[in-house]
């Protein structure tokens, strides 16, 4: 299965039980910042933004004072799982990032999708990739 198929079929899909509710944007990005696959709507990010995200996974709390930036959008960092999941909020939307052995799985959402639904979609794929050694 191609990486793009994972994004299209497992991240940008309808949320279970909620037809037409789906993430706004999604991507799978290598730890080095290389894009493996992304939705057409995923923002163009700067290398320093990806460096900040990777630093926060290695040093939890790094982004808390400045916020998480992706594609020029600033998200307030909210409760995540140290070294495994970063979550951010901006207005009625937000972002979930799950770290796997080789990649970061990104999901960006806006209402009516809820933070919990975004977390479920992103973390389910991230957990699957971890189980596959990726």
UniProtKB/Swiss-Prot annotation:
Phosphorylated by MAP kinases. It holds the Pfam family Profilin. It comes from the Eukaryota. It is found in: Cytoplasm, Cytoskeleton. Disulfide bonds join 13-118. The keyword Cytoplasm applies. The modification Phosphothreonine is found at residue 114. PANTHER family: PROFILIN, PROFILIN-5. Belongs to the profilin family. Occurs in many kinds of cells as a complex with monomeric actin in a 1:1 ratio. This is Profilin-5. The lineage of its organism: Eukaryota, Viridiplantae, Streptophyta, Embryophyta, Tracheophyta.
């Amino acid at each position: 299965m191609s990486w793009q198929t994972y994004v299209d079929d497992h991240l940008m899909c309808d949320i279970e039980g909620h037809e037409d509710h789906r993430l706004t944007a999604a991507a799978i990005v290598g730890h080095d910042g290389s894009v493996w696959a992304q939705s057409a709507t995923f923002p163009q990010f700067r290398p320093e933004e990806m460096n900040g995200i990777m630093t926060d996974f290695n040093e939890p709390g790094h982004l808390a004072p400045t916020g998480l930036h992706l594609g020029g959008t600033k998200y307030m960092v909210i409760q995540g799982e140290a070294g495994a999941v970063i979550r951010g909020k901006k207005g009625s939307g937000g972002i979930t990032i799950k770290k796997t052995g080789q990649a970061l799985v990104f999901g960006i959402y806006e209402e009516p999708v809820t933070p919990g639904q975004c977390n479920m979609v992103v973390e389910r794929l991230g957990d699957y990739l971890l189980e596959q050694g990726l």
